[in-house]
């Protein structure tokens, strides 16, 4: 699907929508085409995703997840910008989980910088993402993660990170 997206992304999207299994294959195919398209022409992919959203909740556009994935491969800051503009909903949750993984792959310092910028207006999302990030980062660098936890405000998110840090610490001690 990615190769086809390089040549004719709209034809690839039409095929994925009409010829693949409606549940998983189609969603995956569309996401991959949009990711490939976003690498080459972010504005075109974004425009198509916005124009072709058929979600029950139009403001919660699952097609933008493919755009975020594609942008994150070469321009994570552009992907983060799209993520931040997403309204609360499934697309934002999925994009945040994906970006948490990408930022943690870049390195602990960049991941913590990204996490510290997450808005505090959605404590559930923040707690979940910081928890996922804390678990991954604790496996990479337990001391740096501990310093990060110390810098966090006492809230649900910091407790989730602390719990994941302690789980990793205990696991390391038992080995």
Residue ranges of model-derived segments:
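Non-catalytic tandem-repeat scaffold regions and their flanking low-complexity/translocation tails
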Residues: 1-175
């Amino acid at each position: 699907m990615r190769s086809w997206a390089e040549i004719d992304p709209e034809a690839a999207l039409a095929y994925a929508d009409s010829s693949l299994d409606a549940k998983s294959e189609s969603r995956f195919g569309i996401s991959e085409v949009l990711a490939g398209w976003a690498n080459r022409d972010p504005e075109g992919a974004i425009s198509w995703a916005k124009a072709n959203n058929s979600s029950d909740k139009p403001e919660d556009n699952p097609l933008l997840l493919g755009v975020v994935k594609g942008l994150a491969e070469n321009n994570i800051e552009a992907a983060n910008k799209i993520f931040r503009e997403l309204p609360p909903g499934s697309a934002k949750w999925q994009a945040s989980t994906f970006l948490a993984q990408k930022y943690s792959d870049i390195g602990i310092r960049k991941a913590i910088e990204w996490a510290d910028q997450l808005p505090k207006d959605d404590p559930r999302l923040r707690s979940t993402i910081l928890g996922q990030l804390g678990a991954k980062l604790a496996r990479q660098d337990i001391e740096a993660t501990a310093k990060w936890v110390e810098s966090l405000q006492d809230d649900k998110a910091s407790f989730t990170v602390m719990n994941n840090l302690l789980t990793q610490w205990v696991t390391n001690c038992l080995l």
